Amino acid sequence: LMVSGSKECRLWLMDTAGIGGDDHRTDVYTTPAFCNEDVNFASAGIWGSLATWLDKQGNRWVLSPFWGPQHSKFKFPITNGVTKRGGVAAFKVQEVNGKIELVPAWISRDMDQGEPPVIANGVVFAYGSGENTDQAYYDVGLADVASRRIPNSTHAVLYALDAQTGKELWNSGTDIKSWLHNGELSVANGKVYIGTFDGMLYCYGIAK
């Protein structure tokens, strides 16, 4: 099986033995849209890569970053506050009535443009990029230009979440002074690394 995401904020579960089926358009399962209710393809939807992990009970998890608020019609069994700017959504790959589905598990706290997470030792490391992703404005219309986007960007925040519930365990607060564009985290030797637009590399680890 493989999973892909889309800017309309759906996940698509496919069989790698025949992706798309005989008609090249049939998947195993498609989630309803869990964000991007306003169909905003600039500042909402899934823009980053997915993550997956296998827990001790043998459950396969799929985690998706997303931008924008949670869809009002989509319900997660575990929530962690109101999600307005983005976050991480977690699903389990499970058999339901004889068919394989992506079953919603939890949604994270609000993050300023949720970006791709990494899972290590039962902890989800995720971040909000702080980037201004607007591409059109009421005063000038379409204006996807650095002169507008950079000044309106803020700063990234790194989060540690419980992988089973999405509960926040820690965040970097205002430590990180800049934002980033389509970046990825790295986790190695008990440390988490995140780079930012201003050329800085931040490293976090457990205090000894």
Give the residues covered by each predicted segment.
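Extracytoplasmic/lumenal domain signature
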Residues: 1-208
